[in-house]
């Protein structure tokens, strides 16, 4: 019993004393250096015919390789930045912010919440199988959002569900 008490006291002493060596090795966080800006996509006609994100393939390829993000997703993020820039010039939403949301929500598309059934972005940039979140029915941990799309996007006519790689709810 005495040994257990001695060990407990030693651990307690170390916990309140901290580790002075690690305190001395800490470097201050620079406050004068902003993070490097992401490479903006080249200007394209986002109102042009066809799938305009395909025009960003050359821009997206090295970014996809460097980041490990699916090229389809990089092109979609870049296209969304250009659309937002045109629609709301003062918005300043950049593709890498969208990529951050995409990573958190679905790891840029493959995470579906099902361990053995990951999604893939097809040639059209659509996740297959579809990524559909849990019903927003007000149960513990979830907001209650009654259906807004008649089940068109989320196959649920009673409640909304977050859909797609970015996990937007249908009303957004």
Regions found by a protein language model. Give the residues of each.
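Hydrophobic membrane-insertion alpha-helices, especially the h-region
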Residues: 1-15
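N-terminal export signals and maturation junctions of secreted/periplasmic proteins
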Residues: 13-85
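Short active-site-adjacent helix-start/loop capping segments
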Residues: 8, 16-21, 110-111
